[in-house]
Amino acid sequence: KEFERYARLHYLYTNKFMITTSWATRSKPKDVSYYHSHNNCMFSGVYYPEVRKGEKIIFRHKDAMIHQFRCNPKAYNHYNSLDVNISVKSGDVVFFRSHMLHSIPHNLTNKNRYSIAFNFIPTGYIGYGDSALEIHYEEFKTK
């Protein structure tokens, strides 16, 4: 439900969303997660149950992957940086578009680092005209 509030507030979407895949990761000391993106989904998220000070997730702008003119700004910000660092703290959830390249820096502590990641797709009516479709799903119910 928290993600649907996020999608309504920031993207103005009215669709419901479902989690299609999820997994837990353990990063041992010195482990790193190199740049990657997620396929077959629209949004992704990651939950950080416990992190140490200075932990972050790094997003790389798509434009960084193509040859282009590169001006030297007098200061870097979200718009002119190739990478955007998002600092996280214990209990944080970060949502992002699944196509965005992202990485997790080396675990420089002597303890394991854990996170839970997940992917979303929209349900209901999506698209327009001859590209429109309707996605349904069955909710799992416990007795």
Predicted regions span which residues?
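Residue-level signal for beta-strand positions within conserved beta-sheet cores that form or flank
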Residues: 20, 53-55, 112
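Hydrophobic residues positioned within well-ordered beta-strands of beta-sheet architectures
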Residues: 20-22, 43-45, 114-118
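A short beta-turn/loop motif at secondary-structure boundaries
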Residues: 16-17, 108-110
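Short beta-strand His + acidic residue motifs that chelate non-heme Fe in jelly-roll/DSBH
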Residues: 33-36, 102-109
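Catalytic core of non-heme Fe(II) oxygenases with the double-stranded beta-helix
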Residues: 26-95, 122-134
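Non-heme Fe(II)/2-oxoglutarate
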Residues: 109-143
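Signature of the catalytic double-stranded beta-helix
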Residues: 1-31, 35-38
